[in-house]
């Protein structure tokens, strides 16, 4: 296999998904830990935060190897985070319903789960459209998509 100087498109997109998911998760963990009073649970949050920060630090050096990446930063409010978190929730819901349906033997329950799966798919589409229209998820512009990942990961890491 030859040595490439850039990542392949498919691995770049997988990296994007991981970094976007973990960045939103890290922001959520850092916001939520403030409310956690139980010392043992708080320690679990700290371990999780440190682990995700390390994951992001290990993945970020690969971003310059992504194909056609441009360097330009811009600041954004929390709307990208909240909408990204909602998109992740919708995506996870779709996956969870799909898995549950494959494990369901009762037709009535299956019908309810299919209905709920379709609702989750619709929610995902609505949130995606919102994010795309507002420039939070530039899915057809890989350079912008990756810049957002880097910005969000760095924001999540530096957040106190």
UniProtKB/Swiss-Prot annotation:
Keyword Nucleotide-binding carried by entry: no
Pfam families, A to Z: Coat_F (PF07875)
Gene Ontology BP term (one): sporulation resulting in formation of a cellular spore
The UniProt record lists the keyword Transmembrane: no
PTM comment: Generates the two 5 and 8 kDa components of the spore coat, after proteolytic processing.
Pro-sequence residue ranges: 1-4
Subcellular location: Spore coat
Domain of life per record: Bacteria
Keywords: Sporulation
Family statement drawn from the similarity comment of this UniProt entry: Belongs to the CotF family.
Misc. comment: Present in an increased level in yabG mutant spores.
PANTHER family on file: SPORE COAT PROTEIN F-LIKE PROTEIN YHCQ (PTHR39183:SF1)
Protein name: Spore coat protein F
Organism: Bacillus subtilis (strain 168)
Highest classification ranks of the organism: Bacteria, Bacillati, Bacillota, Bacilli, Bacillales
Gene: cotF
């Amino acid at each position: 296999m030859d040595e490439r100087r850039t990542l392949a498109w498919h691995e770049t997109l997988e990296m994007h998904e991981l970094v976007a998911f973990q960045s939103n998760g890290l922001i959520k963990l850092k916001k939520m830990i403030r409310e956690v009073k139980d010392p043992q649970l708080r320690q679990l949050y700290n371990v999780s935060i440190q682990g995700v920060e390390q994951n992001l630090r290990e993945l970020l050096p690969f971003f310059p190897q992504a194909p056609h990446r441009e360097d330009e930063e811009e600041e954004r409010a929390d709307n990208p985070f909240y909408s990204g978190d909602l998109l992740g929730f919708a995506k996870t819901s779709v996956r969870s319903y799909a898995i549950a349906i494959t494990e369901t033997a009762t037709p009535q329950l299956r019908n309810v789960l299919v209905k709920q799966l379709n609702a989750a798919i619709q929610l995902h589409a609505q949130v995606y459209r919102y994010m795309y229209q507002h420039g939070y998820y530039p899915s057809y512009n890989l350079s912008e998509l990756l810049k957002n990942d880097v910005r969000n990961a760095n924001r999540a890491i530096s957040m106190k």
